[in-house]
Amino acid sequence: MVKIFVGNLSPNTTAEEIRSLFSQYGKISECDIVKNFGFVHMDSKSEADEAIQNLHHYMLNGMAMNVEMSKGKPKTSTKLHVGNISSSCTNQELRAKFEEYGPVVECDIVKDYAFVHMERVEDAMEAISGLDNTAFQGKLMSVKLSTSRLRTAPGMGERTGCYRCGQEGHWSKECPLDQNGSYREGPSSEGFGPVRFDSGGDRGRGFHRGFSGEPAYAGSFAPSHGFTRGAGYAVPGYGRGAGFESAMGYGMPAGYGVGADNSMAPVYGSEAAYGTSGMAYPGALPAYPIRRPPYEERDPYGVVDFYEKYRARPYGGSYFEDRRAVQPPVPPPPTSTPVVRERLPSNLVDPYERHPLPPPPAPTSSYYVRERSPVRRAPHEAEGYAYERSRLSPISVLPRTAAYDVPRDPYAERARYAY
């Protein structure tokens, strides 16, 4: 049985009309019409060849028919992998080589290997045993059964069966569907189109115009009073070729305790914010004067006097207070009375100045004042020890001086001689 393809049929053509035409050349076992093409099955191959020769381009109902042998690949075909093929080999030469063992349904060459589809399994096994490891155009061929799956992506043979959309007539790289199954966009489509980084041409509404001369995120967001004064996320920001200069930034939102007028005022924005009019960034909004940290305070020449900074001072004074304070006039020399010294400011007292202690007051307690130890008393005229190291000198040898006749406070004496 031979299958004949009949194409380019008129919509008014019926299966009976096709059957009557082909029955003139032989017996017809089956005749079917699908849309604008059909298939005719004839028993004899010679009769089929005669019908094809006479009915090809035959005018039927005002349209010329295309009559040819059906090229549909049988489902029982066997796929062979042919390796180590010469670069000068063509599909016709390879097909002719395998047709010596049986009918070949399809033959495709990919680089230095090829796939050959044979109609019967017996013919495929015979071709493997006869052609494997044999010389063909100067190279030893490797012929074996193919272990690869069915073709899932086009690239070999004819343009049939796009694996993305399932339609025929194009390859996957030409398919209008992208990898995610959505249609690709044209020059005027919406979404992430090719107009994202340019200006001119048809523009979409999505996140286009980012680096062009138009608003940054395009006014696709509705106008709001939340963060900007313009249309949502998008007043001219990153655009106009000016970077941050013409941005209008984050406006003060309404509802934060200020009136509606202030809610629309640009705080970090306007053209003065980032220096379009020659103003610096601090001029964008009024602010408190910047106070430098204490450790950065320096003299006009940028040098810090570490001696003055870290020298010892009385309690309550600081280096920075002394620097800022006006130097007072030199005070007169202080008296020895404690009352006057207490009235002097603490920052005028030299911590390293030593003054004699005031004379102790008269004892008011009834405690017994003990005699001063003779060991601790020494004559003024003596340059060394006036007593021996082994024993104490008699008391009568050391004369008493008038300085020790003054009554002493036992508590003051204890604190003075305590070690």
UniProtKB/Swiss-Prot annotation:
<dbReference type="GO" id="GO:0003723">
    <property type="term" value="F:RNA binding"/>
</dbReference>
<dbReference type="GO" id="GO:0008270">
    <property type="term" value="F:zinc ion binding"/>
</dbReference>
<keyword id="KW-0479">Metal-binding</keyword>
<protein>
    <recommendedName>
        <fullName>RNA-binding protein 4.1</fullName>
    </recommendedName>
</protein>
<dbReference type="InterPro" id="IPR035979">
    <property type="entry name" value="RBD_domain_sf"/>
</dbReference>
<feature type="region of interest" description="Disordered">
    <location>
        <begin position="322"/>
        <end position="341"/>
    </location>
</feature>
<feature type="zinc finger region" description="CCHC-type">
    <location>
        <begin position="160"/>
        <end position="177"/>
    </location>
</feature>
<dbReference type="InterPro" id="IPR034897">
    <property type="entry name" value="RBM4_RRM1"/>
</dbReference>
<dbReference type="Pfam" id="PF00098">
    <property type="entry name" value="zf-CCHC"/>
</dbReference>
<keyword id="KW-0694">RNA-binding</keyword>
<dbReference type="InterPro" id="IPR000504">
    <property type="entry name" value="RRM_dom"/>
</dbReference>
<dbReference type="InterPro" id="IPR012677">
    <property type="entry name" value="Nucleotide-bd_a/b_plait_sf"/>
</dbReference>
<keyword id="KW-0539">Nucleus</keyword>
<feature type="region of interest" description="Disordered">
    <location>
        <begin position="349"/>
        <end position="371"/>
    </location>
</feature>
<feature type="modified residue" description="Phosphoserine">
    <location>
        <position position="393"/>
    </location>
</feature>
<keyword id="KW-0862">Zinc</keyword>
<feature type="domain" description="RRM 2">
    <location>
        <begin position="78"/>
        <end position="148"/>
    </location>
</feature>
<dbReference type="InterPro" id="IPR001878">
    <property type="entry name" value="Znf_CCHC"/>
</dbReference>
<dbReference type="Pfam" id="PF00076">
    <property type="entry name" value="RRM_1"/>
</dbReference>
<feature type="domain" description="RRM 1">
    <location>
        <begin position="2"/>
        <end position="72"/>
    </location>
</feature>
<keyword id="KW-0863">Zinc-finger</keyword>
<dbReference type="GO" id="GO:0016607">
    <property type="term" value="C:nuclear speck"/>
</dbReference>
<dbReference type="InterPro" id="IPR050502">
    <property type="entry name" value="Euk_RNA-bind_prot"/>
</dbReference>
<keyword id="KW-0677">Repeat</keyword>
<keyword id="KW-0597">Phosphoprotein</keyword>
<dbReference type="InterPro" id="IPR034898">
    <property type="entry name" value="RBM4_RRM2"/>
</dbReference>
